[in-house]
């Protein structure tokens, strides 16, 4: 009966791999109706989930007893997607009513899937405000599988500071093998195949089972192959001749042609490598070590001699060179498991030009490419069978005849750790042995699977090196060390730097530094190279809002909403567009739409709160900022928004507390320090306010907002000359800001220089003839500065000399000064 089920299951997986979800669902329903097994249940639920019907998968699994780990994990995943967090936790760890399972229990139960299970459980804990337990789950997940990125990302976002050097490393062989199930346990099997039969071993998918049974190519004791879920970068020549086996140091038997060949490295992506040996890379198969003294890249790759099988005498051998069939920039461990290329293998093969009855190929089942970050295989076959196994996302055997391999000149390598192709001899050639082994009288044979594993581990180490650098940059960004983040990410290899994700992080860093011109430049580059990217575009839209670029913002919002109407980023961009046009009611509707699309999107709540502030609906604004904090307690923009509202309500102590909370999250923000200084001065802490403003100016020496407020505090403390010096410097930064000239006039009035005071008041009127800044002056706290006795000029009376010169931090967004202190960070 099992044999009859396998073709149906194979057809289902083939439909899934080709995104034919309706066909997959239909066939899976037929299979489950025929066979009410746990495997068929899981397959049907998988079809529902992949087709975007998580609620169907949830109800199906919920209505049946889920005993296998794979069904439990999928059910918990559905619960999380449907916001049933408590139920998801109950399924994975036992919940609050039952005895909770420890991490070790979860590892024992879920096996290779434990890293994903712990990551999902950590997400549940963080969403339910149990950050400590969530952090433990994320860290355990990373220790089990350092190829995962999202747990590290989540740790950074909740305020933890994981060490990338300790996180992204292959600590042991066991650690590496846990990411690649059974990578080094698959044995070499030798098959005597007739001439022109395929001499390859391919990992089978359900749809390939029958053909593989016919060819009898599956190793009887091999449950998995290295290509568990993906065929990423592969050797399309299908064979590596016996003389391709790596040799020990200095043991190569080289032909004259090989010795004269220039030493080159060949990329696993095709074409010569342009990267230096120290460049973090994981798509490079080096054909020589970087330098005679540096064998670290592939250390221990070929430290033991190899026994080389060769062709019979007189049989010219067609040698193949290990090369990549893929082109472009795809590399090892980077693709999904749904590609359909033929999976490569390492095969020791000889082909005679004359009739040859049989060969004895040395077949290596584990290939050198496998994505450790892909989902691990199911722990057992969907249908038990002695003759074959059925696996997900493997590659289809399409080769009916062996490929014709043209004669090639061999690539050689003379240094330690490389691939060497000796010339063909009439008999078995044994390479020179390591001196230590010779002295002991021992001969050790390097098996092909160990060689493949070492190659694989070297590629994985390259990926680890890249992840460490990216992790350092992302950690610095989440800690708001923006300059450090920019420096780290800018030194990534160019092909990684010029990607949307990296550039978005750099653009966000410039945005946090209030360097909006630089941020716009970076984000525009993102739009050029990845016009389909939506993530991060909400920051780009706010950048354009700050720069008052209404046309570019309109184009961006139109493109995003046309591309993805279910994206909160698109509606945030549309809201910013109308906010810039001062159509606040429409902007509010768009921000509310963003929240409707994703209720857990904190930035949409923050933008909505700022719009309510502009329409003087402070109670609604307070609710929005509190919701943003509920969704993301580390969203410092919302803490700032609360402080701003309390300042407007003259609740200065509450304002200072909330500004300080925002500063604790983002200690590098000069704008937050500036606002704290303003509140401290309002609380009659003038000296402390000056110290705070000085710190802000140290962080950002050219921040006009900080310098203006420091000048205002100096003026209030009757330090007129210091205030005048500060204002003269500020005038060079913002030469068209009327408030600066107005405060200079106030200073000259106090110094008794009436003619200079009149001149500056006149300039202020010229820069602001319609009195647009009167809205600011009307909102100024009269306690901030002492009132003047009498206005000395008509201009000063019009400008409101009895008012303080401090900005209200909220209004008149058409001035340069306000742009620097905008509500929207």
From Swiss-Prot:
Composition-biased stretches (Basic residues): 396-414
Annotated Gene Ontology cellular component terms: anaphase-promoting complex; centrosome; cytoplasm; mitotic spindle; nucleoplasm; nucleus; spindle
Composition bias type Polar residues, residue spans: 326-341, 363-372, 381-391
Main location: nucleus
TPR repeat residues: 6-35, 38-65, 67-99, 115-145, 465-495, 499-528, 533-563, 567-598, 601-631, 635-667, 670-702, 704-734, 737-768
Organism: Mus musculus
Biochemical pathway: Protein modification; protein ubiquitination
Function as written in the Swiss-Prot or TrEMBL entry: Component of the anaphase promoting complex/cyclosome (APC/C), a cell cycle-regulated E3 ubiquitin ligase that controls progression through mitosis and the G1 phase of the cell cycle. The APC/C complex acts by mediating ubiquitination and subsequent degradation of target proteins: it mainly mediates the formation of 'Lys-11'-linked polyubiquitin chains and, to a lower extent, the formation of 'Lys-48'- and 'Lys-63'-linked polyubiquitin chains. The APC/C complex catalyzes assembly of branched 'Lys-11'-/'Lys-48'-linked branched ubiquitin chains on target proteins.
Cellular compartments annotated: Nucleus; Cytoplasm, Cytoskeleton, Spindle
Post-translational modifications reported in the UniProt record: Phosphorylated. Phosphorylation on Ser-427 and Thr-447 occurs specifically during mitosis.
Keyword terms of this UniProt record: Cytoplasm, Cytoskeleton, Nucleus, Phosphoprotein, Repeat, TPR repeat, Ubl conjugation pathway
Gene Ontology annotations of biological process type: anaphase-promoting complex-dependent catabolic process; metaphase/anaphase transition of mitotic cell cycle; neuron projection development; protein branched polyubiquitination; protein K11-linked ubiquitination; protein K48-linked ubiquitination
Chain's gene name: Cdc27
PTM-bearing positions, type Phosphothreonine: 205, 209, 313, 367, 431, 447
Stretches the record annotates as Disordered: 306-423, 782-825
Superkingdom of origin: Eukaryota
GO function terms (MF aspect): protein phosphatase binding
Modified residues (Phosphoserine): 291, 339, 380, 387, 427, 436, 439, 822
Classification via InterPro entries: TPR-like_helical_dom_sf (IPR011990), TPR_rpt (IPR019734)
Protein name: Cell division cycle protein 27 homolog
Subunit organization: Homodimer. The mammalian APC/C is composed at least of 14 distinct subunits ANAPC1, ANAPC2, CDC27/APC3, ANAPC4, ANAPC5, CDC16/APC6, ANAPC7, CDC23/APC8, ANAPC10, ANAPC11, CDC26/APC12, ANAPC13, ANAPC15 and ANAPC16 that assemble into a complex of at least 19 chains with a combined molecular mass of around 1.2 MDa; APC/C interacts with FZR1 and FBXO5. Interacts with RB. Interacts with FAM168B/MANI. Interacts with MCPH1.
Family as reported in the entry's similarity comment: Belongs to the APC3/CDC27 family.
Compositionally biased tracts (Low complexity): 349-362
């Amino acid at each position: 009966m099992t044999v009859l089920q396998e073709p149906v299951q194979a057809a289902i997986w083939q439909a899934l791999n080709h995104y034919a979800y309706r066909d997959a669902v239909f066939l899976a329903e037929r299979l489950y109706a025929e066979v009410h097994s746990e495997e068929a249940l899981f397959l049907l639920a998988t079809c529902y989930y992949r087709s975007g019907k998580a609620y169907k998968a949830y109800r199906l699994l919920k209505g049946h007893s889920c005993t296998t780990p794979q069904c439990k994990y999928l059910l918990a995943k559905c619960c999380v997607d449907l916001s049933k967090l408590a139920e998801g936790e109950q399924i994975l760890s036992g919940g609050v009513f039952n005895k909770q399972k420890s991490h070790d229990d979860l590892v024992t139960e879920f096996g290779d899937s434990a890293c994903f299970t712990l990551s999902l459980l950590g997400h549940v804990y963080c969403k339910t405000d149990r950050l400590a337990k969530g952090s433990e789950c994320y860290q355990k997940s990373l220790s089990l599988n350092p190829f995962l990125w999202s747990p590290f990302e989540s740790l950074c976002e909740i305020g933890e500071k994981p060490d990338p050097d300790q996180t992204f490393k292959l600590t042991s062989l066991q650690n590496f093998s846990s990411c690649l199930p059974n990578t080094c346990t698959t044995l070499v099997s030798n098959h005597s195949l007739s001439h022109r039969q395929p001499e390859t071993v391919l990992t089978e998918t359900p749809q390939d089972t029958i053909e593989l049974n016919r060819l009898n190519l599956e190793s009887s004791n091999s449950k998995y192959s290295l290509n568990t879920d993906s065929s990423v970068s592969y050797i399309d020549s299908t064979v590596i001749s016996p003389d391709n086996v790596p040799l020990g140091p200095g043991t190569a038997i080289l032909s004259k042609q090989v010795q004269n060949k220039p030493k080159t490295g060949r990329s696993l992506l095709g074409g010569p490598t342009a990267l230096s040996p120290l460049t973090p890379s994981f798509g490079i198969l080096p054909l020589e070590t970087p330098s005679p003294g540096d064998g670290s890249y592939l250390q221990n790759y070929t430290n033991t001699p190899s026994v080389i099988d060769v062709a019979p005498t007189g049989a010219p051998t067609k040698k193949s060179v290990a090369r990549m069939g893929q082109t472009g920039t795809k590399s090892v461990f980077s693709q999904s498991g749904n590609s359909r290329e033929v999976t490569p293998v390492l095969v020791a093969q000889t082909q005679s030009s004359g009739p040859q009855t049989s060969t004895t190929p040395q077949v290596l089942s584990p290939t050198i490419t496998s994505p450790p970050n892909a989902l691990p295989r199911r722990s057992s076959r969907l249908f038990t069978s002695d003759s074959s196994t059925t696996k997900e996302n493997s590659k289809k055997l399409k080769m009916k005849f062996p490929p014709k391999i043209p004669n090639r000149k061999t690539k050689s390598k003379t240094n330690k750790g490389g691939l060497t192709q000796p010339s063909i001899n009439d008999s078995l050639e044994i390479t020179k042995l390591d001196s230590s082994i010779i002295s002991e009288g021992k001969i050790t044979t390097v098996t092909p699977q160990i060689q493949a594993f070492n190659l694989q581990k070297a590629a994985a180490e390259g990926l680890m090196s890249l992840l460490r650098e990216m992790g350092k940059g992302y950690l610095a960004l989440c800690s708001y060390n923006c300059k450090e983040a920019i420096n780290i990410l800018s030194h990534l290899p160019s092909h990684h730097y010029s990607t949307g994700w990296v550039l978005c992080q750099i653009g966000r860093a410039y945005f946090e530094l209030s360097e909006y011109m630089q941020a716009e430049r970076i984000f525009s580059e993102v739009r050029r190279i990845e016009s389909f990217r939506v993530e991060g575009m909400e920051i780009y839209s706010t950048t354009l809002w700050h720069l008052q670029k209404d046309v570019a913002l309109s184009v961006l919002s139109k493109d995003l909403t046309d591309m993805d109407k279910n994206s909160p980023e698109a509606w945030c961009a549309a809201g910013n567009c109308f906010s810039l046009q001062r159509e606040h009611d429409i902007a509010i509707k768009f921000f509310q739409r963003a929240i409707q699309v994703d209720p857990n999107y904190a930035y949409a709540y923050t933008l909505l709160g700022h719009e309510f502030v502009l329409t003087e609906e402070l109670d609604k604004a307070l609710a929005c900022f509190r919701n943003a904090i509920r969704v993301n307690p580390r969203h410092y923009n919302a803490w700032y928004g609360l402080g701003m509202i309390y300042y407007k309500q003259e609740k200065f102590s509450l304002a200072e507390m909330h500004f300080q909370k925002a500063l604790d999250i983002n200690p590098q923000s000069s704008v937050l320090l500036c606002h704290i200084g303003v509140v401290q001065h309002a609380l009659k802490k003038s000296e402390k306010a000056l110290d705070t403003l000085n710190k802000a100016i140290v962080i950002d020496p050219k921040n006009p907002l900080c310098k203006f407020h420091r000048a205002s505090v100096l003026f209030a403390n009757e330090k007129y000359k210091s205030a005048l010096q500060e204002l003269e410097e500020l005038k060079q930064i913002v030469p068209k800001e009327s408030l600066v000239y107005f405060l200079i006039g106030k200073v000259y009035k106090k110094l008794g220089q009436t003619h200079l005071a009149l001149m500056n008041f006149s300039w202020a009127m010229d820069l602001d003839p319609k009195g647009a800044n009167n809205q600011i002056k009307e909102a100024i706290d009269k306690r901030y500065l002492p009132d003047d006795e009498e206005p000395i000029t008509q201009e000063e009376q019009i400008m409101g000399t009895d008012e303080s010169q401090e900005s209200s931090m909220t209004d008149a967004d058409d001035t340069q000064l306000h742009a620097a202190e905008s509500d929207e960070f």
